[in-house]
Amino acid sequence: MLEVVGIDADAALVAQWRARVARAVHRLGWDGEPRIVARRHAKGMSLAVTAPFDQLFTATELNEWALCSALHDRDPSHWGALKETLVAAAIESGSASADTLPPAIDEEPALARLEKLAAAEARPDLRALVDATESRELPWLLDDELISIGCGAGSRSFPSSSLPFVADVPWSELHDVPTALVTGSNGKTTTVRLIAACLRAAGYRPGYSCTDGLFIAGETLDSGDYSGPVGARTVLR
C-alpha cells in the first residue's frame, strides 16, 4: 500500500495509476484477479494492490513506479526529476538492486526491471509448502524468519531459509485450534482477558496476546504491548 499525501490525486491520475498497475501485474503473471484499490481519506489517498505472498517487495516497487509514471506523464516539467529521485532513494535505502537495476520511469524498462525483481524474490519452495498446507486445510503463519503450520500444540515452525520437503512435514501431527479475534476502539484487552478467564473456568488452556503481554494457560510468557501481529503469531505457534 502506498500513502499519497500532498498530491492532487484526482480521478484521472488514479485511473492512470490503476491502468499501469494492471499492465504490470499482467506482465508479471501473478495468478488470480488482484485487487487494485484507491481509497480517499482526509489527508490524501491510499493506493493498494494485492500480490503473491513471496512478491511483496516487488509489489511495493510496482506500486511506486505506477504512481510516479502517472505523475510524470501528467506534468513532465513539474515531475521531471522523479527518476533521479527514485534512484537516489533506492541507493540511500541500501537496496541491493539499486546499482544493477536502477528504478526507471519509462514503462518498458520499468516492467523489465520488475520482472527481474520478481524472479529474484520468488520462493517456489515456499509456495509448494503453502499449497500443500492449504490443500490440507491447515493454517500457516509467515514472518521474516519462520513459517509455521498448524496452531497451538499442533503447530510446527520451520526456518524460512531451510524449508522441509512437503513429504518430510509431519502432517498427521499438525492441526488447528479454536481462535477468536477481538477488534474495536476501546476494551479489547479487557474483553480478551474476560474470554480467557471463562475458558480457564471451563477447563481449557487458552493463550492470548494483548497490550499487557503474552499469556498461555494463565502464565505470563512476556510483558509488554503484544497487541500486534508478532504477539498473535507467538501465541498461535
Where are the predicted features?
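ATP-dependent carboxylate-amine ligase catalytic core
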Residues: 172-175, 197-237
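Preference for protein termini
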Residues: 1-179, 201-206, 211-212
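Residue-level recognition of alpha-helix initiation/capping sites
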Residues: 123-124, 190, 227-230
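Glycine-rich phosphate-binding P-loop
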Residues: 178-195, 199
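Alpha-helical scaffold segments in soluble metabolic enzymes
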Residues: 128, 132, 194-197, 234-235
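Hydrophobic alpha-helical scaffolding
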Residues: 116-119, 185, 222-225
